[in-house]
């Protein structure tokens, strides 16, 4: 038996942080959101921030570039899942190894 599950996910981010991230890492958050479209993306816990939210790392391919996206999960009032992007950059060597294993 096979089920198809369709979930609407909304992405959000701080626009100023997006501009700063582009300057620092050369990755914009709109492109970073595409990591979640990679069927083989890898998800790992990062840490809990000062506000008590659990941060996550998603690693996935976007246009043949392997990116790491730091994000948190939130829910809207109507129950829609929200992924808030905090930062994004190209992966480091050890992070790439974890993706391709």
Predicted regions span which residues?
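Ribonuclease/tRNase effector modules and their secretory precursors
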Residues: 1-101
């Amino acid at each position: 038996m096979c089920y198809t599950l369709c979930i609407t996910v909304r992405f959000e981010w701080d626009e100023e942080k997006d501009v700063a991230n582009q300057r620092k890492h050369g990755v914009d958050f709109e492109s970073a959101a595409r990591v979640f479209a990679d069927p083989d993306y890898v998800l790992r816990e990062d840490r809990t921030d000062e506000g008590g939210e659990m941060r996550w790392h998603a690693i996935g391919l976007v246009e043949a570039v392997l990116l790491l996206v730091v994000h948190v999960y939130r829910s809207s009032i109507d129950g829609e899942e929200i992924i808030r992007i905090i930062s994004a950059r190209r992966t480091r060597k050890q992070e790439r190894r974890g993706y391709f294993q």
